[in-house]
Regions:
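Non-heme di-metal
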Residues: 1-271
Length: 271
């Protein structure tokens, strides 16, 4: 895993988030859209606001391994970028005239699940949230006319796509060490957790989705499609590692450092 490339990326990108200039126009969305949208974004804002202390602790377990040197630093910067997302979303909620949350039931469930087992499971739960966030911010980007919401969702969509690639780089190396049964079990539980979570999120944010002209069932289906695309790419990376007995850092760029497929990420959100 080319952790140094990710360290460089996160160091640069987090600064861009904190200095992002937002439009100064007053929100003109009708209350029927503005009110549920503010509450919905506040939920995602809370989810991005964690300190990542337990994730960092898990990361320390693999950081000494040869192919994960620098991973601890990369995780620290990843968490810092998540917190920069929280600050951006807080500005968006304020723009919409909403209130920030200190607790919310789905967020509490995510946090508890994330630390039940080990680093791989923690990343799996985190991945579920990020795959759904990719669909969510893609929906806002294409469906919401407010310039602040549009700009923030555009930026966060691109960042989430990078986060997914970062996690894929890590997981492909870890899963390549599993036997066939371990891989099957990992895939099955990942798919089940993601499907359940997508159903819950679609229901929890149904008022916002409908205000934007999106059927919650369609949103859920897009989330499931996002999982399928991601899993296919992850398995492709694992196969590449299986076929290579020696992988030197200078022989190839990590999968996460290719240009993000932004067109693909937004295409399935189009009306």
């Amino acid at each position: 895993m080319n952790t140094q490339a990710w360290i460089t990326h996160f160091e640069r990108n987090t600064r861009l988030n904190d200095t992002l200039e937002l439009p100064t126009e007053t929100c003109t969305l009708p209350d029927a859209t503005r009110v549920p949208l503010a509450a919905s974004i506040a939920t995602f804002q809370l989810g991005e606001s964690g300190t990542g202390s337990r994730l960092r602790r898990y990361a320390r377990e693999v950081a000494p391994l040869e192919n994960f040197r620098g991973y601890q630093r990369a995780i620290d910067l990843f968490v810092a970028e998540e917190q920069s997302h929280s600050r951006l979303l807080a500005r968006t909620v304020e723009h919409l005239g909403g209130k920030l949350l200190t607790k919310q039931w789905t967020n509490s469930v995510f946090r508890r699940l994330r630390f039940l087992v080990n680093l791989e499971f923690a990343i799996q739960v985190l991945l579920t949230a990020e795959l759904i966030a990719e669909v969510y911010f893609g929906t806002l980007y294409l469906r919401c006319s407010d310039p602040v919401v549009n700009k923030v969702s555009h930026k966060l969509l691109r960042d989430e796509m990078k986060h997914l690639a970062f996690q894929r780089d890590f997981l492909s190396e870890r899963i390549s060490t599993f036997n066939d049964l371990g891989r099957w079990l990992w895939r099955a539980q990942f798919q089940a957790i993601h499907a359940i979570t997508a159903t819950v999120v679609a229901w929890d944010h149904r008022h916002t989705l409908r205000a934007l002209g999106v059927n919650p069932a369609d949103f859920r289906q897009r989330c499931l499609q996002a999982w399928t695309r991601y899993q296919e790419r992850l398995e492709s990376e694992v196969v590449k590692l299986d076929q290579s007995t020696i992988r030197l850092p200078h022989e190839s760029q990590p999968s996460g450092q290719t240009q993000p497929d932004f067109a693909s990420a937004t295409a399935h959100h189009a009306p």
